[in-house]
Amino acid sequence: MKGSVFRKKSIQDLIAATSGEKSLKRELGAFDLTLLGIGAIIGTGIFVLTGTGAVTAGPGLTISFVVAALACLFAALSYAEFASSVPVSGSVYTFTYATLGELMAFIIGWDLILEYMLAVSAVSVGWSGYFQSFLSGLGIHLPVALTAAPGAVKGTFTLFNLPAFVIVMAITYLLYLGIKESKRVNNIMVILKILVVLLFIAVAAVYVKPHNWQPFMPMGFGGVFSAAALVFFAFIGFDAVSSAAEETKNPAKDLPKGIIFSLLVCTILYVTVSAIMTGVIPFAQFAGVDHPVSLVLQSAGQNWVAGIIDIGAVLGMTTVMLVMLYGQTRVMFAMSRDGLVPGSLSKVHPKHKTPYVATWFFGTMSALLGSLVPLDELAKLVNIGTLSAFVLISVAVIVLRKKQPDLPRAFKCPGVPVIPGLAILFCLFLILNLGWVTIVRFLVWLLIGLVIYFLYSRKHSKLNQ
């Protein structure tokens, strides 16, 4: 098995590595996990992609959100089983190494690199839209060429999204210095984000004109499913809950609660917001708009509330970028430590104690992509990366049930293999709705990864030594 691409890290070794001096403190309950999930989920999806989704599906966007939420729920139950039976930090990459072997772990790690890097880029584009909306409220306007990526706004010459570039580089610098994430700060930020969304609902609901909901599905089910594949981005982040397994007081009870409650709260908020948005403004007016939520309020003459929404969106999306870039470096660090990518990526700064090479490299890449590539293209690639990860996790649950039926599982996914099977079908269906261009781009990325694995990673893997 030494040279095999299917060699595995044993689950017992993974769990043993977390005990002793390097074990994490178990202090998170179901409430903390729910807020952690909501904190990671609410961001660009609700503040930005609701506009793009409305153009694709019309008022039927509400159904798109429910379809995307179902795909997430089925995958989430598989995630919860994994997290409770392999309660180790390192997310899907670690789980896959233990169950499906090294090659699949490398592919998922390579997939996560794409997902996290492009997620930071996509969120930075949304952040830029709200930041510029906030500036224009103060009478400050940037040169048009520096407001968006080339080709992002039809009929307008744009060259470079300067605010998107600057915010990612600023966050990269913060992470290079070292940042202590705290439960309290996250909980306060999340409550603030929820309040901003509730404020929008309360103020905008009175301006709804029901005739704007006709026709409900102007592009038919095709439009609804295409939008579901796009707004799936709005739910990315709930997997952050499962990666906190090591720090949860009672993983068996609290993990599934945290995952399901956070998905439920976000789905209700998303459906309500999209119904109000398409009720206030005819859906076609959202074309090319990267601050749709505040646009709705501006059109209703509620400029001061729009300003509050802009600030809330800017703060909310800053935390999402921070967590995503942090997660990116953590996956890279794990892969580098396992010998699958060059050792320099796990180099730790002598003073700041941070993986500084990985931080600066991926921070710069994310900043450039965010400033040069339009948002919907970025979002589609993030989605295909995440959906592929969900498919693999669901397959891994079925495999692990067969291969290791006696493994202690604090939480069991109900209805195996039906529920993981539904997750696989839903996710593959959404992948097909992302369009062939996105699928081909993703396959090219995977092909580059496979070349790297067979030329470098297989030889340098720690399991090979």
From Swiss-Prot:
Keywords: Amino-acid transport, Cell membrane, Membrane, Transmembrane, Transmembrane helix, Transport. Disruption phenotype: Mutant is still able to take up isoleucine, leucine and valine. Deletion of the gene confers a weak resistance to growth inhibition by serine. The deletion of the three permease-encoding genes aimA (ybeC), ybxG and bcaP results in an unprecedented resistance to serine up to 100 mM. One of its GO terms (molecular function) is amino acid transmembrane transporter activity. It holds the Pfam family AA_permease_2. GO terms for cellular component: plasma membrane. It comes from the Bacteria. It is a multi-pass membrane protein. Belongs to the amino acid-polyamine-organocation (APC) superfamily. Branched-chain amino acid transport system which is involved in the uptake of isoleucine, valine and probably leucine. Can also transport threonine, and is active as a minor serine permease. May be an amino acid permease of rather broad specificity, because several amino acids, albeit at 100-fold excess, are able to prevent isoleucine uptake. Probably does not transport methionine. This is Branched-chain amino acid permease BcaP. It comes from Bacillus subtilis (strain 168).
